[in-house]
Amino acid sequence: MLKQRSEKVYDLASLAQTEKFAKLSPDFTTIWNYRREILDHLFNEGQGQFSTLQGKLEVIKNELMMLVKQVMASPKSYSIWEHRVWTITLGLKLEREFIAAMKAKKLAEKAEEEKKQHDAA
């Protein structure tokens, strides 16, 4: 796992491995840091489920669900709580982007409708 991190292997398989290792050793901060690096990379690459805001929000939701299980198993693990804060912060940022995109879409639709009405008159 550490070799993968040093080689900057940021893929879904590595993400799955970090989850397994985190369950075995929730206080191993390096695993959580690597997990954040993987998620950052996947979000920035924007492929597959990471290509849309809705997909990214779904990933965040799944990450939070995984973290609930981790917190229940190890409620005093600082590393888990730190990752949870990071995940929530990222989720809020993405949610703001999603809301802004939806508002922009509605404004564009309204402007298009007004243009059609104006052209018809």
Regions found by a protein language model. Give the residues of each.
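Generic preference for flexible, low-structure residues
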Residues: 45-47, 94-96, 115
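Internal amphipathic alpha-helical repeat/solenoid segments
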Residues: 1-79, 91
